[in-house]
Amino acid sequence: MRKKSPGLTMLIAVSLLAACGSGEGVVERRPKTPVPFVAQISINEVMVAQIDHAAHFIWEAANPENTAIEVQWREVEHHAIALIASGSAMTMGGTGVNDAMWVTQSGWRDFVSQMNAASVQALNAARDRNLTALGSAGDNLVESCEGCHQQYKPSIPTEGLMHPH
């Protein structure tokens, strides 16, 4: 029979105690919180260059005079996705004078959430090739945009930016 080494037995015992310990003094590894990204453009620039452009495409596609065959469904999908992605940009702020203030307000976040929900609705309508659902999504998008503009952007245009629509 082999004789066990007292040093090895002690090492195993200490290791087991450490493994079964209370965890005090153990450093937890948590994912690092990313530093918030702030765009090098203003929220208004995002609205004019991306949101307005995408929303108008959806509104034009949802025109009741169109037939489902006439609608460019893949383009509607692309514009709905652009709107969904823009929602994130609308919550991060930017270089505009009011951007930092807007993104902290619950009303602002509510309007962004409404825009996002309408955009997801438009995306689903496009994927289903459903003109009626696209019209409903367009109406909801108008409601979120107009409500937000009335509260946060009563004087159009701001920052000297204009859109072609």
Predicted regions and their residues:
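Sequence context surrounding c-type heme c attachment/ligation sites in exported
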Residues: 23-165
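Bacterial N-terminal signal peptides that target proteins for export
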Residues: 1-10
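Extended hydrophobic/aromatic-rich secondary-structure runs
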Residues: 4, 21-24
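C-terminal motif of bacterial Sec signal peptides marking the signal peptidase cleavage site
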Residues: 17-19
